[in-house]
Amino acid sequence: MVKIGNVEVNKKVVLAPMAGISNSAFRRICKSMGADLVYAEMVSDKAIYYNNKKTIDMLYMTDEERPIAQQIFGSDVDSFVVAAKYIEETMHPDIIDINMGCPVPKVALKAQAGSALLKNPAKIKEIVKAVVKAVNCPVTVKIRSGWDENSINAVVVAKTNEEAGASAITIHARTRSQGYSGKADYNIIKQVKEAVNIPVIGNGDVFTAEDALK
């Protein structure tokens, strides 16, 4: 059993927040197959800030999905706080998760969100501290190994998040520049796990049950 803040995770089977896939129906299917903690697909802090109906509809969740985490992406501290508070007050997820790993150009380059935050640990600390202060539920963070092969900083980023009050770290062991190509470097996950005192969830290249058991 692992504790993420006050949330007990009894199995080491966690559903990732896959954009366009991890909706309520899919999450319930995964729950029936043995997933314990499930993550809802990411939503934009700005879209919630401006009350975008399509985004608000994406927040739908049911009690049978618990424990459940709702992931948010963005780059503005105030928008993150507004979105996190709205989600907690309306949907009551067990966990709020902050996306610092999405590599797609629309998010990382245009919006300077997702994995773009890896380049700015000071801003990471500011965002996480503000969200932790704004909500009552645990706050977790999803990161990558780094922006590119010349800036592998997962350990620094993980420590920064822990210092800011994050209750757990998920790391996709690829860089932003890799996207979903190449292979995940599980040694990076090991380094992060050894560097922090909060739970670390490994992510990347889990295609089969055998992969998960590794």
Which residues does each PLM region occupy?
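Flavin-dependent oxidoreductase catalytic cores
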Residues: 1-214
